Every structure is written in structure tokens, then in C-alpha cells.
């Protein structure tokens, strides 16, 4: 296999955001140089707000909570305990296939959620994975995507709300969205689902897309 997986830390071993970002950048440089294989990093972060390149001032926390500015696309979001993060550091087979890459990330999450009876889907014009409006409420986001591609290798990735507290979202305009809500797998399934519960299924779903996504450059360590 050309794709590897590394668990940096799940509850109670939460990963500081800056430490995780440093790990991403170091691994990215190695993958670009063909000194390491494409790898998906799995983890839970300690609580933090991060702001993508499109974040506007009025979308920042209302209480002045510090925010980490990052080099991914997208806007402001929260990461923390109860949310599974996957950072694919992949050398893309098709360097121009960014839309296909994003759709495959969405497919990974949708398939995992289906295992728990959760009907997650894409909504046109909205990034990430969603539960469409129903008797429980309006459209609500259950997973986020924010990526960067540099020198043909991806960074950042996906965040799946498993059993995280939604209170931090009340302090921000999450992802710049004002007309929809936020939810978790646990809320939608009616039972507790943790990042540790779904991590292996996320790995299995990524494996299904490996051949289509991941380049195997000569000289890479496989």
C-alpha cells in the first residue's frame, strides 16, 4: 500500500493545534521530497478556533477568544474534544483534480455516517457534509472540510463532529454560515459515538479511494 495512517492522539490524549500543524508541515515537506509516503493523520485537538483565508472580522468569536490563523481555505471554525480530525497529507495522482479530491473526502464521511443510520449528504452551495432540514431542525452541518494543496501534496482535511460540545459554536459564525445549524453524530443517532468509535471506519473508507487519489512517485518510501 502507498497510503499510511498515523494516530497522533485521541481522547484523553488531545493534540495541541500548533503541534499538530507543525507535524503536518514537516510531513508535507517529506512527502513532497519523496522522503515519506502519503499519510493520513488522525487525532482529536485540544479546543481551539482556527480561521481560514476567507474569514472576516465579524465572524470571529464574540467574546474575544484567541484564534489561530491558518493557511487552509474556508472560514472560521472550532476544533476540540469529541471531534475526529483527519489530515490527509497526500501526493495527488491528479494535481488538478481538487474538486474530485474534495468530493472523495465527503464520500468518506457520508459512508461512515451511514453505518450509524445517519443520512448525511452534500448540499449544493455549502461546503462539508450536512443533515438536510427535517422535523428536528434546519440544515445542520455535521462535518467540515478545509484543505490546502501545495506542490501537489494536500494539507489540512476533515473534521467530523462525533460527541463534541456545540457550545463553542455559539460564539462564532461557523464557516461563515448564518442560516443553518451545527450537529453531531451522537445527536443525530441518539446515542454516544466517539472519535475512537469511528476512526477505523474512516481508515477503511480512505482505503477505497487510495488508488484513485494517491500518486506513487519513484523513490518514495512505501
Swiss-Prot record:
<keyword id="KW-0012">Acyltransferase</keyword>
<dbReference type="GO" id="GO:0033819">
    <property type="term" value="F:lipoyl(octanoyl) transferase activity"/>
</dbReference>
<feature type="site" description="Lowers pKa of active site Cys">
    <location>
        <position position="141"/>
    </location>
</feature>
<keyword id="KW-0963">Cytoplasm</keyword>
<keyword id="KW-0808">Transferase</keyword>
<feature type="binding site">
    <location>
        <begin position="72"/>
        <end position="79"/>
    </location>
    <ligand>
        <name>substrate</name>
    </ligand>
</feature>
<dbReference type="GO" id="GO:0005737">
    <property type="term" value="C:cytoplasm"/>
</dbReference>
<feature type="active site" description="Acyl-thioester intermediate">
    <location>
        <position position="175"/>
    </location>
</feature>
<dbReference type="InterPro" id="IPR045864">
    <property type="entry name" value="aa-tRNA-synth_II/BPL/LPL"/>
</dbReference>
<dbReference type="InterPro" id="IPR004143">
    <property type="entry name" value="BPL_LPL_catalytic"/>
</dbReference>
<dbReference type="InterPro" id="IPR000544">
    <property type="entry name" value="Octanoyltransferase"/>
</dbReference>
<comment type="pathway">
    <text>Protein modification; protein lipoylation via endogenous pathway; protein N(6)-(lipoyl)lysine from octanoyl-[acyl-carrier-protein]: step 1/2.</text>
</comment>
<feature type="binding site">
    <location>
        <begin position="144"/>
        <end position="146"/>
    </location>
    <ligand>
        <name>substrate</name>
    </ligand>
</feature>
<dbReference type="GO" id="GO:0036211">
    <property type="term" value="P:protein modification process"/>
</dbReference>
<comment type="function">
    <text>Catalyzes the transfer of endogenously produced octanoic acid from octanoyl-acyl-carrier-protein onto the lipoyl domains of lipoate-dependent enzymes. Lipoyl-ACP can also act as a substrate although octanoyl-ACP is likely to be the physiological substrate.</text>
</comment>
<feature type="domain" description="BPL/LPL catalytic">
    <location>
        <begin position="34"/>
        <end position="214"/>
    </location>
</feature>
<feature type="binding site">
    <location>
        <begin position="157"/>
        <end position="159"/>
    </location>
    <ligand>
        <name>substrate</name>
    </ligand>
</feature>
<dbReference type="Pfam" id="PF21948">
    <property type="entry name" value="LplA-B_cat"/>
</dbReference>
<protein>
    <recommendedName>
        <fullName>Octanoyltransferase</fullName>
        <ecNumber>2.3.1.181</ecNumber>
    </recommendedName>
</protein>
<dbReference type="InterPro" id="IPR020605">
    <property type="entry name" value="Octanoyltransferase_CS"/>
</dbReference>
<comment type="similarity">
    <text>Belongs to the LipB family.</text>
</comment>
Amino acid at each position: 500500500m502507498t497510503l499510511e495512517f498515523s494516530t497522533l492522539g485521541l481522547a484523553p490524549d488531545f493534540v495541541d493545534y500548533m503541534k499538530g500543524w507543525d507535524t503536518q508541515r514537516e510531513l508535507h515537506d517529506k512527502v513532497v521530497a519523496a522522503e515519506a509516503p502519503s499519510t493520513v493523520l488522525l487525532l482529536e485537538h485540544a479546543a481551539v478556533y482556527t480561521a481560514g483565508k476567507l474569514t472576516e472580522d465579524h465572524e470571529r468569536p464574540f467574546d474575544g477568544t484567541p484564534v489561530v490563523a491558518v493557511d487552509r481555505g474556508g472560514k472560521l471554525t472550532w476544533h476540540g474534544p469529541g471531534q475526529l480530525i483527519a489530515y490527509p497529507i497526500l501526493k495527488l495522482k491528479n494535481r488538478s483534480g481538487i474538486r474530485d479530491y474534495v468530493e472523495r473526502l465527503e464520500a468518506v464521511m457520508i459512508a461512515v455516517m451511514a453505518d450509524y443510520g445517519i443520512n448525511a449528504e452534500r448540499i449544493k452551495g455549502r461546503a462539508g457534509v450536512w443533515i438536510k432540514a427535517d422535523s428536528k431542525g434546519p440544515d445542520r452541518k455535521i462535518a467540515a472540510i478545509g484543505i490546502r494543496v501545495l506542490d501537489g501534496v494536500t494539507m489540512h482535511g476533515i473534521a467530523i463532529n462525533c460527541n463534541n460540545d456545540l457550545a463553542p459554536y455559539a460564539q462564532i459564525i461557523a464557516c461563515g454560515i448564518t442560516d443553518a445549524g451545527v450537529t453531531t453524530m451522537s445527536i443525530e443517532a441518539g446515542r454516544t459515538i466517539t472519535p475512537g468509535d469511528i476512526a477505523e471506519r474512516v481508515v477503511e473508507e480512505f482505503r477505497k479511494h487510495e488508488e484513485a487519489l494517491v500518486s506513487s512517485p519513484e523513490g518514495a518510501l512505501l
